[in-house]
């Protein structure tokens, strides 16, 4: 399985919140625990419906949060046409972090 981007790993390992709200997309995020990520990636069949992406959480509204090979962040509906419905929401995890709000 491909590696998670360094900025994402730094965020998670620093003890920052594993859920929160953002201005703009994703609006809300819930990150998968690192020790559960590979199992959840398999359980959600990410390799089957979104090949080339690394699942790492959801927006709480039926969409997977995933990285592509460049580290860009995408939202992909759990029900739909997989990669054809993938929507790029940030060039990197740090861009999502910059949008985190208190509400």
Question: What is each stretch, according to the model?
Answer:
Residues 1-65, 101-103:
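A surface-exposed partner-binding patch
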Residues 68-71:
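Short acidic-glycine loop/turn motifs at beta-strand connectors
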Residues 75-80:
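Catalytic Cys-His active-site segments of thiol-dependent hydrolases/isopeptidases
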Residues 82-103:
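Compact, glycine/acidic-enriched structural inserts
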